[in-house]
Amino acid sequence: MTNAIQTEDLVKKFRRVEALRGLTLDVPEGAVYALVGPNGAGKTTAIKILMNIISATSGRAAVLGVESSQIRGHYLQSIGYVSENQQMPEWMTVGALLNYLRPFYPTWDTNLEAELKKQFDLPRDRKLRHLSRGMRMKAALASSLAYHPKLIVLDEPFTGLDPLVRDELIQGLLDRAEESTIFVSSHDLAEIETFASHIAYLEEGNLKFEEELSSLANRFREVELTFDSAATVPQNQPASWLQLSAAAAVVRFTDCRFDAERTPADIRGVFGEPRNMTFSPMSLRSIFLTMAKSGRNSA
């Protein structure tokens, strides 16, 4: 499968701060790929390198088969880019902005432009400086989708937006997902879970993992064991058991390598036969909270 974005051992240092520490990503064409992690994890730094806004200290990055250091001019006609704090010409109206941008993109679709203006309820004659944060984001996204980009790059697009606006933006993206690769950074896990196909978790510049969201959801389970008498935390247990605790006759933990056959067998090998075993699916937020609290790399 061809990659829309590929990075290899990407490092970025700002004086004494190492914002990225050997980041390697493979973003397949057609994916809705989410780069997630806490604030300060390095997500925006990675995107700025991909968009040739800043240079990497070392390593390499390619976007649509082109080295990111070469992304400029006509290459930008295939990329839609929207960032959280994107600068826009405040004196322009929404209509003037679209009129200004249209000639720069040979693939600009006026029918799609009209459709996006209607879908996002954009006020054509209102100046950008007078728009709410959510409406500004809609205007930025509409101007980045109207030319059918092969790649859509979004840096924290949902920050500070009310739920209705977030839903409208997500729907606008999903309506075009079949023709574009979408690469989005966010710390809003609840939103990401609703539409991403792939996910990568970045923490302090380190990539903790990268995989399909369905695979991640399948391998994480909250486990609860009930015994006939008081239970204790064993000294030795599989490395994939995170946040293990015992209270009275109940043991709880998260298994980050859940397998319907192996996990019960491992439990019996460590504890003997419990009176009851339950395995519950986890939300994306619960998965990342567990990982952060565990402080392990076993995931």
Spans of model-derived segments:
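Generic alpha-helical secondary structure signal
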Residues: 73, 111-114, 167, 214, ...
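Residues that cap or initiate secondary-structure elements
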Residues: 18, 31, 55, 229-231, ...
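Short, Lys/Arg-enriched, disordered terminal segments
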Residues: 1-2, 298
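Short loop/turn segments at beta->alpha junctions
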Residues: 93, 212, 280-283
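ABC transporter nucleotide-binding domain
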Residues: 167-258, 278
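C-terminal coupling/interaction segments
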Residues: 249, 255-299
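ABC transporter nucleotide-binding domains
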Residues: 2-7, 12-203, 208-209
